[in-house]
Every structure is written in structure tokens, then in C-alpha cells.
Amino acid sequence: MKITVNRGLDLSLQGSPKESGFYNKIDPEFVSIDLRPFQPLSLKLKVEQGDAVCSGAPIAEYKHFPNTYITSHVSGVVTAIRRGNKRSLLDVIIKKTPGPTSTEYTYDLQTLSRSDLSEIFKENGLFALIKQRPFDIPAIPTQTPRDVFINLADNRPFTPSPEKHLALFSSREEGFYVFVVGVRAIAKLFGLRPHIVFRDRLTLPTQELKTIAHLHTVSGPFPSGSPSIHIHSVAPITNEKEVVFTLSFQDVLTIGHLFLKGRILHEQVTALAGTALKSSLRRYVITTKGASFSSLINLNDISDNDTLISGDPLTGRLCKKEEEPFLGFRDHSISVLHNPTKRELFSFLRIGFNKPTFTKTYLSGFFKKKRTYTNPDTNLHGETRPIIDTDIYDKVMPMRIPVVPLIKAVITKNFDLANELGFLEVCGEDFALPTLIDPSKTEMLTIVKESLIEYAKESGILTPHQD
């Protein structure tokens, strides 16, 4: 199937990494096991400060779903366990042991039963890689998915492409073979043919994949790489009992690497980007998952007025230098943007020849040209205002979902109405563009994300229950 996305926005942000190649690998001294994505679930810590851990060792367990673990991808010593509001777990910091210390496994994918595969996925932290729709939460191991979608079309700003991730291997052929093994493991575990969504320019081993998966291509501007759009186009979710699992290209590489190489894949490709970062420092690097920011960029060169983001500028997590930030669990980029503290002189009279605008507030909005954010920053240009009931949001929402009525239903906790409007098909990140262009400065992304978790808790899916 060919998915064509017409609505959206061409985000050609300045500050992208250089395309000239990779610098040497960066081996950080400290890494983080990020537990923030698992906050919807109750976790039970399996380590304490000062404990020695090896690669593959359990760090935390799903409290209500025993024997499902979040594991360490490195060997070392736990130096800190950081908590947030109400003592919620943020991350576990590990000081790496020098040298190769990977734990070796031996698995024969062909002879393993589905039950054996399930235990391997849960015990080795592979299940923690999977996300679940509806609600966009960590996948629940007791749920049986109707479909599995694998996303190779992610086009968020500054996010490394699948081709970049293949630099982890000695050749493209080896990388794609690891990917095929990962797809085979997923297909066997869930007893179905997963859907793989990619872009035409990516050369996949289609002959091998056609026998085990459904292949779809997608084209169009951001957010055409969103799994929500892929599911909406191929097999929409109509009720909360229709479970769909989603994975990224990197997740499948991690799964395939364990079954093929017998080791946890501990490295990743990371983009260092943003206009507040010196052009000589914008690049792609190969480093350990969960690496510290300080090992990848010199934080002393970052102004206190600049914004550090783990992830992309639209959906990433804001970080502070003094909090010793680390890469997030699913983040493959560090974005550094300017955060202006002074208002422009006569800002209310600015014509805006080269200003980004979607509502034609500036003169640049009347020129038919490729929209480019010449120097993206985090300036809101105003305070929060009453939400405007207009169709501008729908022009950047590719799915047939009315943005303003849905946001109003979610804010008022009218989940029955929200479901009728398509609430079960979306995730918070689908509202990144409506949030970006919103004249009222409403944090739609955060509102939707938190409301999905609240609704998931109300539904009882996050705790064991008898059918």
C-alpha cells in the first residue's frame, strides 16, 4: 500500500547535523537507564545504589506483570537512582566498567516456541522496546496485538534516518540482515505478519521481507512519519480493545541483534544538532545508549539562555545543564536551541520577511516558497490565550480528526466524546504541529499525552484484571 500525506508542514530547520559522515565513536563514562517512558506503569526497582550490574541484568520490573524487565545494556556500578515528583522514578545512572563486558546468549530462533520467545522478550528487556495503541503506552505483556507496525519513515526534525543507523554495522547488508532477523522474531512471537512502513528512497531487502511482513511506502511532509498516520491509513483502531503494537527501526535492530549476535545492542547513532550549537559540532556520532550529554557536547560552551533537548525540537524532553542530563530511552538526537530572553524592538511592527508563519501573520506567509525556519528558537512570542476555534489546526493534521473539538473534549474529561472524535487513534506527538502553529499557545501535545495516560488508568489496562 502507498500512503500519501498531503497535510502537514515542511520543517526545514537550520542547525541540522553535517551529512559528511561520522566522527569517531564516543564511549561515555556514565550512562542512564531512562525510566520516564514507563511512568504509566508501576515499577519495582531491582537494584540499589552501589550495586554492580552486568549487561542484560534487570534494572526494574513491571510490578503488575511479573518477570517483565527493563534491563541494563552495559556493565558497571549503579551510582545514582534519580526520582522526580512524588518520588516517581526518573532514571538509574551507571558508571561503566572499562572494556567489553557484554553478556553472551545463545538462541536458535527456528527452534524456539512462541512461549519461549515471550519469556526471552520479557526477561531480556526486549518487550520494553514495544509501545501499545490505543493510549501510546509501554506494551502490556498480557495483551495480544491485532497488528504490529514497524516504522522506518520517522521524519521528525534532526532525527537520524534508517541509513544512518546502519553505520552501527560493518555493512548495509549486515544491518538489513539483522533487521530481517528482528522482523522474523516479532512475526513468530505474535503469530502475524507485521506492517513495515518506509520511504521509497530506502532500499530494503523486499524479497526476504515480503514473505514475513506487509510492506507499505509513505510520502509527504512532517508528520507523515507518525505511526498514528500509518495505522489510520492501513488498519484504523475503532475501539479500545483493538490493540496495536508499534516499534521503530532501531528497536527491531536491537531485537535482531540479540538473536543473531547473542548480545544486547548497546550502541546507537545520535544526532547533535541545533542552531545554538557551533556548526563544527553538529554531526552524527556513534555512542552508548543513554549517554550523558557532557560526554557528547561541552556543556560549558552552552549558554544558560540556550535550551537543551533530549530528542527533536518538537517532541523532545527539556533538560537543564545543572541536572546532568542524559539521552532518553527512545531519543536519538540532542537539540540545542536559542532561548531569547529579550523582546525584539518594535516587535509589534515587525514585517517578518524571513519569519516562520502558518497563519500569514508575517509577510513571509504570502510568498509561495519552501518554508524554512531560518533560526529556530523557543520564543513563544506571547502568553497563553483563550483557544481559537478555527480550522488552521486541521490543515496540519493529516488524519481525519477535528483538532479543536477533540482538545475541548479532552480538557473537559469527556472521554466518550473524545473517542468518537478519534482519541484512540492519536498520541501526544501527533499534536506537535497544532501546538507549534497555535496562536493561543495551548500545550496540546502535553494535554493529549497526559489525558491518554489518565484514560488508560481509568480503563484498568495498566493493572491485572480478569477477562
Swiss-Prot record:
<dbReference type="Pfam" id="PF24836">
    <property type="entry name" value="NQRA_2nd"/>
</dbReference>
<protein>
    <recommendedName>
        <fullName>Na(+)-translocating NADH-quinone reductase subunit A</fullName>
        <ecNumber>7.2.1.1</ecNumber>
    </recommendedName>
</protein>
<keyword id="KW-0739">Sodium transport</keyword>
<dbReference type="InterPro" id="IPR056147">
    <property type="entry name" value="NQRA_N"/>
</dbReference>
<keyword id="KW-1278">Translocase</keyword>
<dbReference type="InterPro" id="IPR008703">
    <property type="entry name" value="NqrA"/>
</dbReference>
<dbReference type="Pfam" id="PF05896">
    <property type="entry name" value="NQRA_N"/>
</dbReference>
<keyword id="KW-0830">Ubiquinone</keyword>
<dbReference type="Pfam" id="PF11973">
    <property type="entry name" value="NQRA_SLBB"/>
</dbReference>
<dbReference type="InterPro" id="IPR056148">
    <property type="entry name" value="NQRA_2nd"/>
</dbReference>
<keyword id="KW-0520">NAD</keyword>
<comment type="function">
    <text>NQR complex catalyzes the reduction of ubiquinone-1 to ubiquinol by two successive reactions, coupled with the transport of Na(+) ions from the cytoplasm to the periplasm. NqrA to NqrE are probably involved in the second step, the conversion of ubisemiquinone to ubiquinol.</text>
</comment>
<comment type="subunit">
    <text>Composed of six subunits; NqrA, NqrB, NqrC, NqrD, NqrE and NqrF.</text>
</comment>
<keyword id="KW-0406">Ion transport</keyword>
<keyword id="KW-0813">Transport</keyword>
<keyword id="KW-0915">Sodium</keyword>
<dbReference type="GO" id="GO:0016655">
    <property type="term" value="F:oxidoreductase activity, acting on NAD(P)H, quinone or similar compound as acceptor"/>
</dbReference>
<dbReference type="InterPro" id="IPR022615">
    <property type="entry name" value="NqrA_C_domain"/>
</dbReference>
<comment type="similarity">
    <text>Belongs to the NqrA family.</text>
</comment>
<dbReference type="GO" id="GO:0006814">
    <property type="term" value="P:sodium ion transport"/>
</dbReference>
